[in-house]
A protein has these predicted regions:
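Periplasmic-binding protein-like
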Residues: 199-208, 246-270, 316
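Extracytoplasmic ligand-binding site segments that recognize negatively charged/polar headgroups
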Residues: 83, 88-229
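Conserved C-terminal helix/tail region of periplasmic/extracytoplasmic solute-binding proteins
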Residues: 325-357
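Mature extracytoplasmic/periplasmic domains
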Residues: 269-329
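Ligand-binding "clamshell"
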Residues: 98-106, 127-131, 242-254, 316-318
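A ligand-binding cleft/hinge motif common to bilobed small-molecule-binding domains
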Residues: 93-96, 226-227, 231-249
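Early extracytoplasmic/lumenal segment of secretory-pathway proteins
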Residues: 7, 22-96
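Short beta-strand->loop
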Residues: 104-115, 133, 249-260, 270-272
């Protein structure tokens, strides 16, 4: 009888152990699935070694995808097919996603490294109090030129590009707002102008630039400049920075009429499945050392004040890429234009592109 009870007790103990082991494996599987983090960013816009470092430190597996335009990113978030946990929209797209109630309200207590950010780049008009977004990188649109090819030129005005001596030697970034803004700026209008007449005037004025334009290009613009396929370019500051800092023959200027001051940001979409992981990732990127490493790799200007102090002096003190407060007074941040005006910009840009053929 005693042996019988021992067998029963042993069976019960074994059963309990089996249940505990089964529960442990299920729990581990659930934890693993929850610890995937879906990140959606611009191409070539993060030092991938930092992602590996984050994975090693946290045990969270990062599923990393890229996009090539705000519109493509916005469409995917609206569609909701993939539940991205962190995305990187520009300022005017933050406004659009915010209006559509597609962004999570941020808990700053979960991002302690937010203290590293420069107050000059916080609480901006597109997101007061940074309720929905945290700045990641910022920059401008300006003129990059070869000083050896054009030693007597300063390119301090958009109007300088129209001179016939630059025939077939100017490269333009492939962006509707960036190029139409050039025409608007030159005519004294706002970069966020919605007046169809003004947009049409800017387009008409750009047609006068056409003989000087060699091409409207994408990521290959750097290679084309290095291969002397163009000696003047309208580019984002992050494209210009590596060329200027590595080769004294280049210079980058913001024309006196003004230009765009843009911001790319980190946000958490409403549909995010791993919001805690998203906060960890954002906080990780805002760490001073991580941000400095990322900034040197990407090449754009960082709003992270603590990180900036770790950058080489020639980088952090370069006013061309870290414009002073006074300089910023003549720069404009993009706003959401609304679909009608955005269509007007795109149509005018397409007309201009067609005129180059």
């Amino acid at each position: 009888m005693k042996r019988f009870f021992q067998l029963i007790i042993s069976a019960i103990v074994i059963g309990i152990l089996c249940l505990m082991i089964s529960h442990w494996f299920k729990s581990k599987d659930n934890t693993h699935s929850n610890e995937k983090l879906y990140v959606y960013n611009w191409g070539e816009y993060i030092d991938l070694s930092l992602i590996k470092k984050f994975e090693k430190e946290t045990g969270i597996q990062v599923v990393y995808e890229t996009f090539d335009s705000n519109e493509a990113m916005e469409a995917k978030i609206r569609n909701g097919g993939t539940h991205y946990d962190v995305a990187f929209p520009s300022e005017y797209t933050v406004q659009k996603l915010k209006k559509a109630k597609l962004l999570e309200t941020l808990n700053h207590d979960k991002i302690p490294n937010i203290r590293n950010l420069d107050n000059d780049y916080m609480n901006l008009s597109y997101d007061p109090n940074n309720r929905y977004s945290i700045p990641y990188f910022f920059g401008t649109v300006g003129i990059l030129y070869d000083k050896e090819k054009y030693p007597n030129e300063t390119f301090d005005s958009w109007d300088d590009l129209y001179h016939s001596q630059f025939k077939n030697d100017i490269l333009l970034v492939d962006g509707a707002r960036e190029i139409i803004e050039m025409g608007l700026n030159k005519l004294g209008y706002s970069l966020n102008d919605k007046n169809p007449t003004h947009i049409h005037q800017a387009e008409k004025d750009l047609h006068n630039l056409a003989p000087q334009v060699r091409g409207i290009v994408g990521d290959e613009i750097t290679m084309m400049l290095q291969q002397n396929e163009g000696h003047v370019a309208v580019v984002w500051s992050g494209v210009a920075a590596p060329l200027v800092q590595e080769n004294t023959r280049y210079n980058y200027v913001i024309p006196k009429e003004g230009s765009n001051l843009w911001f790319d940001n980190m946000v958490i979409p409403k549909t995010a499945q791993n919001k805690e992981g998203a906060y960890k990732f954002m906080n990780f990127l805002l760490d001073a050392q991580n941000s400095a490493q990322n900034t040197e790799w990407v090449g754009y200007a960082t709003p992270n004040k603590a990180a900036r102090s770790k950058l080489p002096k020639k980088v952090r003190n370069d006013y061309r890429f870290y414009p002073s407060n006074q300089e910023q007074q003549r720069l404009e941040v993009y706003k959401d234009l609304g679909q009608t005006s955005l269509s007007d910009y795109n149509e005018s840009f397409l007309n201009f592109k067609m005129s180059l053929k």
